[in-house]
Amino acid sequence: MSAVRADVPLAHACRLLTHGPTVIVSAVHEGRRNLMTAAWSTPVEFEPPRILVVLDKSTYTRELALASGCLALNLPCSAIVDLTYTVGRVDGRELFEGLDKFERFRIASFEGPVLGLPLVEGCVAWLEGRLLREPRIEDTYDAFFVEIVSAQADPRIFAAGRWNFVQENSDLHTLHHLGAGSFALPSATIQAVRLD
């Protein structure tokens, strides 16, 4: 499923993560690339857009992100739930007949517009960012601060700075990891009004 992409203003970039979706983190360094699933990411600042993502010490994606100083967050949807689960369960250091995860699982990708990071086709949003190094926090908590430098989303589900989760686009709904290979989907978007 090839996605439609539209730029998201950086002022709205954090809105892509405020509902707590599972993300696929991708990174590249000196021609080596990898991706992994991460359940824990959140906005921490809106201007400039900064997020926090947890990357376990044992992961190859973390190693590449540290070496390059940048990473990307790809927001997968229900249409690619099996791929999302699989890339989170396979170690990127274990090559399959010399193939990296992108090649092994036939993951189509495209270059990010600012940092040239590998972004995953079939997702519904993409963010590129530079690491804001905090070694003590990284080593103690596996938490990484990232300043977002580019954001894109599929306008069929995210437009004008807002998510639009409706039954008609359920194959585009983001994934929310519940553990042990189970995921939840947002079922609808509702609008609140302020009480007087």
Q: What are the residue ranges of the model-derived segments?
A:
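Basic, polyanion-binding surface patches
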Residues: 1-196
